[in-house]
């Protein structure tokens, strides 16, 4: 069996209950897996010290692909604002901000987000993921998605949802392999500066 397919190491998870919402607050301590190039990938929850690197990640990835919602010049968060955002993710039940690292460098980010505070939405979560282009195709996105979905189930979610641009064939193929199914198309979801439009696919997976 290839190294990148081996089971990941035992992970230590700190879980706190939120009795009112019925979902869990989770901090994922570092776990390690091998990618297709036999590089060690560390997966862990983000903390406040990651703010600067996350801001850089947002600016770079938004310029590398047409499949994200923001242009690079729209990333205007200050370091303090990003620190506050990370802190809120650490403290909010039902949220996980997962970072992937190789040799101490952030290579990707995957988030588990609640769909809102309403009790009738408490069974649903949203997944979002992006990697630096140079690290795509090495199995890192898959391992991050697998980890995020496992933790989402542990937090009490019953289904995971995501939105993906219709032209993003590689991402859609990965999501379908992981059990996501399309349930709708949103025409003209995004409009680019050159006047082109892009549709989006809504996808969902039962956990």
Feature-to-residue mapping (PLM):
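A short, well-structured alpha-helix characteristic of acyl/acetyltransferase catalytic modules
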Residues: 24-76
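Acetyl-CoA-dependent GNAT
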Residues: 75-134, 146, 206-207
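Conserved catalytic-core motifs of GNAT/GCN5-like acyltransferases
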Residues: 161-164, 176, 181-196
């Amino acid at each position: 069996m290839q190294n990148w397919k081996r089971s990941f190491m035992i992970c230590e998870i700190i879980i706190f209950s939120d009795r009112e919402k019925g979902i869990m607050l989770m901090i994922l301590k570092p776990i390690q897996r091998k990618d297709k190039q036999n590089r060690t990938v560390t997966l862990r929850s983000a903390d406040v010290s990651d703010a600067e690197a996350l801001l850089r990640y947002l600016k770079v990835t938004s310029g590398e692909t047409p499949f994200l919602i923001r242009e690079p010049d729209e990333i205007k968060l200050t370091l303090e604002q990003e620190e506050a955002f990370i802190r809120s993710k650490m403290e909010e039940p039902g949220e996980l901000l997962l970072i992937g690292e190789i040799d101490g460098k952030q290579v990707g980010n995957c988030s588990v987000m609640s769909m809102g505070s309403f009790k009738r939405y408490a069974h649903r979560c949203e997944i979002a993921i992006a990697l630096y282009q140079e690290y795509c195709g090495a199995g890192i996105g898959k391992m991050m998605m697998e980890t995020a979905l496992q933790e989402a189930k542990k937090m009490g979610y019953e289904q995971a949802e995501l939105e993906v641009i219709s032209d993003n064939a590689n991402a859609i193929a990965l999501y379908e392999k992981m059990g996501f199914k399309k349930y709708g198309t949103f025409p003209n979801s995004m409009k680019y500066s050159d006047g082109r439009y892009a549709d989006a696919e809504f996808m969902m997976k039962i956990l």
